Amino acid sequence: MPEMPEVETVRRTLRPLVVGKTIDHVDIWYDKVITGDPETFKRELKGKTFTAVDRYAKFLLFRLGDLTVVSHLRMEGKYHLTTWDAPVDKHEHLQFAFTDGSSLRYADVRKFGRLQLVETGTEFQVTGLKNLGVEANSPEFRLDYFEKGLKKRSMNIKSLLMSQTLVAGLGNIYVDEVLWQSRINPLTPANELTKDQVKQLHSAINETIEEATKYGGTTVHSFLNAEGGAGHYQEKLKVYGKEGQPCPRCGEDFVKIKISGRGTTYCLHCQKR
């Protein structure tokens, strides 16, 4: 699943491709890609112009004046620019056809991604954004906020970070990475972390998100940006996907377990309970 650095990379590559373009019409080839009524989606967007492409955590926000399209890529969602009349691939589910003859298409092999049309300004009340915590590596993600939030929660730290309810934007890749960097066992209850561990984890989250974004995200399966380019942070990963390989810090082999249904790789020596 694209995490915050990947979605930010998509946003940055999408912005120059679509901002200023006016929608002639919208084609929807898979109705379930739309949260809400597909016909309303098509009707309301006709004649609208893309004014900005924003992001919150893992969500893209396409701004069209008084309307916003909130897009969650989920596991495999991708956007790319093409033309109205280009052949439609079986994994392409929607296109914004622009008045200049180009089109922005949404493709999704798994069909998990969703787009929702809302009035601009209501996106944090009526979409999945309403359930999210503050963004990682943002001014709102203060150390005192993080400390207080952790103290109120007894679930294990891996599951809490994956839930997006305290801090939003991290997924399986970066959670494994930041816990390893902080020497925290992923099964540790959040409210049992020491003050030093919380401080280390807070720093690791911010630094990892910033660095991964600088490298264009991580491509370990199929992630591509809007220009069709892969990320490069996979070359920097220390723990994710390295089950059975030696920990670069202590030399002990990484192990992999499941926590809340998600594969979790960590070092038994460096990340003791």
Curated annotation (Swiss-Prot):
A zinc finger (FPG-type) spans 238-272. GO terms for molecular function: 8-oxo-7,8-dihydroguanine DNA N-glycosylase activity; class I DNA-(apurinic or apyrimidinic site) endonuclease activity; damaged DNA binding; zinc ion binding. The keyword Transmembrane helix does not apply. CDD domains: EcFpg-like_N. Keywords: DNA damage, DNA repair, DNA-binding, Glycosidase, Hydrolase, Lyase, Metal-binding, Multifunctional enzyme, Zinc, Zinc-finger. Its cofactor is Zn(2+). Binds 1 zinc ion per subunit. InterPro entries: DNA_glyclase/AP_lyase_DNA-bd (IPR015886), Formamido-pyr_DNA_Glyclase (IPR020629), FPG_cat (IPR012319), MutM-like_N-ter (IPR035937), Ribosomal_uS13-like_H2TH (IPR010979), Znf_DNA_glyclase/AP_lyase (IPR000214), Znf_FPG/IleRS (IPR010663). It catalyses: Hydrolysis of DNA containing ring-opened 7-methylguanine residues, releasing 2,6-diamino-4-hydroxy-5-(N-methyl)formamidopyrimidine; 2'-deoxyribonucleotide-(2'-deoxyribose 5'-phosphate)-2'-deoxyribonucleotide-DNA = a 3'-end 2'-deoxyribonucleotide-(2,3-dehydro-2,3-deoxyribose 5'-phosphate)-DNA + a 5'-end 5'-phospho-2'-deoxyribonucleoside-DNA + H(+). Its EC number is 3.2.2.23, 4.2.99.18. Pfam families: Fapy_DNA_glyco, H2TH, zf-FPG_IleRS. The active site is at P2, E3, K58, R262. Coiled coil: none annotated. Involved in base excision repair of DNA damaged by oxidation or by mutagenic agents. Acts as a DNA glycosylase that recognizes and removes damaged bases. Has a preference for oxidized purines, such as 7,8-dihydro-8-oxoguanine (8-oxoG). Has AP (apurinic/apyrimidinic) lyase activity and introduces nicks in the DNA strand. Cleaves the DNA backbone by beta-delta elimination to generate a single-strand break at the site of the removed base with both 3'- and 5'-phosphates. This is Formamidopyrimidine-DNA glycosylase. It comes from Lactobacillus delbrueckii subsp. bulgaricus (strain ATCC 11842 / DSM 20081 / BCRC 10696 / JCM 1002 / NBRC 13953 / NCIMB 11778 / NCTC 12712 / WDCM 00102 / Lb 14).
